[in-house]
Amino acid sequence: MLVFIDDGSTNIKLQWQESDGTIKQHISPNSFKREWAVSFGDKKVFNYTLNGEQYSFDPISPDAVVTTNIAWQYSDVNVVAVHHALLTSGLPVSEVDIVCTLPLTEYYDRNNQPNTENIERKKANFRKKITLNGGDTFTIKDVKVMPESIPAGYEVLQELDELDSLLIIDLGGTTLDISQVMGKLSGISKIYGDSSLGVSLVTSAVKDALSLARTKGSSYLADDIIIHRKDNNYLKQRINDENKISIVTEAMNEALRKLEQRVLNTLNEFSGYTHVMVIGGGAELICDAVKKHTQIRDERFFKTNNSQYDLVNGMYLIGN
């Protein structure tokens, strides 16, 4: 079984093909604490051990391990998150080959060539032995690595002339990856990566504001509040101190403005593109501003309804 994995810092996205040809996708959030969860009743608990450390999935714990940093790519918790995604995907536990990702700043060196040291480091990370208390884990046999951003434009690029180019803007939890790719995937004109700019800029601001509203929680909770930021009933349900909701929304909106402006400033480094595509978990937050800033007409601007799956779908189309 070959499984394509976009192992982003906020969520793990999987895509694979069943034996009957059906294409399946699965998403699993990254929210793990360094201790085992308490078992109760029939509810399945995922308690892992890796390198002598205990981990468990916990979507609400404020003590969840921070994954929005570049070190995440080679960390133990990355391995835990990928195995957890596999175990919750519905796939039978077995041996699998995987294709995973690295941000552009990690996949390429300063000369825009594949960074073999980082790529091998990423592969080696998945050779670590992990155990599941009371259960079996997948055995990862072969590991291949693709760069982020670029594969997401595969379908669009096949339809473009070789003199056209697609600007692919991939805003994730930790990084902003931008690539300018020639039509038919005939070449890559320019790449850019910022490992310090991602949706985590907003997540951190929301978490800090939530603490003031007596709602200390995980990054997963903060991200869910960002997603439902326009739903007042949801905010009242999630935020303990109703009188402090405005503090949370003001902090969130200010962080969103900063994120948007930093992305737009980066886009000024690119020129000559004919089409634009916005992908990643942060696509919804910036797509309108990007479209206005680039002044690309409607039929040349691409933003799917499932932006989080764009990268893993492109990986699947290229590698399957």
Curated annotation (Swiss-Prot):
InterPro entries: ASKHA_NBD_ParM_R1-like, ATPase_NBD, ParM/StbA_N, ParM_C. It comes from the Bacteria. Pfam families: ParM_N, StbA_N. Keywords: Plasmid, Plasmid partition. GO terms for biological process: plasmid partitioning. The keyword Signal does not apply. GO terms for molecular function: identical protein binding. Involved in the control of plasmid partition. Required for the accurate segregation of the plasmid. Belongs to the plasmid partition ParM family. Homopolymerizes into double helical protofilaments with a longitudinal repeat similar to filamentous actin. This is Plasmid segregation protein ParM.
